[in-house]
Amino acid sequence: KYRLVGSEMCIRDRPWPVLLMRQPYGREIASTITYAHPSWWASKGYLVVIQDVRGQGGSGGEFSGFNQEASDTSQTHNWVRSLPECNGLLGTYGFSYQGLTQLIAEEGTPPPDCIIPAMTGLSEDEHWSCEGGAFWWHLGIGWGLQLAAQKAQREKNWKGWHEIRENLESKKYLYNGHDLLEKYDPEGMAYKWLNLSSSKTPQWKTHKPLGSWLKKPLLLIGGWWDPH
């Protein structure tokens, strides 16, 4: 059993169309490095819901990356549509990891009314981690260590958190990032992808959106590729 936690924002107490973002980096941030603050969307007449995915931020359970998102997306959509503040319309937004959470769900899940993944990937090989068979070393390890640092923080492993931070700030992770991932997040996606990229028989996973979802209005700006 686990509980998913989200923050809601709207300007008045009445039913509104919902804008939903599901992300692993802390719902307080809400991707505001690239998107307007949720209060801006709320001022335009939306109920904005920013949710921490399973095992991240305030949500319970263990974080296992993309593998958990189809079932949790379905549950979240059902919950959002049941909110008294929701008028029945649901749109999703966010890029990168937040983009993929918009596209995968359990079979039979009703689609949202519109989808805005902006820039994301489906193939964990070609879209998320490698170029021409070569692993995105700087990007992949840096992102993996970001998630490993969040894991250490959640577990109150401050020694590990400080070691990861020092390596990121000094750029030492470019040399010993593989060892840090093995030490602090061996089950994480980045470490698994790194090892798969050097395997002679890699078993890469490609995520497949439901056909009914792809018939809905969808805004994809950067294509099926995530080099962010």
Language-model features and meaning:
Residues L220-G222:
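Short beta-strand/loop motif that positions the catalytic acidic residue
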Residues R12-S82, S129-C130:
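Cap/lid segment of the alpha/beta-hydrolase catalytic domain
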Residues P84-Y97:
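Alpha/beta-hydrolase fold nucleophile elbow
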Residues Y35, S43, I104-G108, P112-W213:
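Accessory cap/linker subdomain of secreted extracellular hydrolases
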Residues I50, S59-E62, G99-Q102, P111-P117:
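Catalytic cores of eukaryotic secretory-pathway lumenal/extracellular enzymes that build
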Residues P227-H228:
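Conserved alpha/beta-hydrolase "acid-adjacent" motif
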Residues K1-I11:
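Single conserved hydrophobic/aromatic residue that forms the stacking wall/gate
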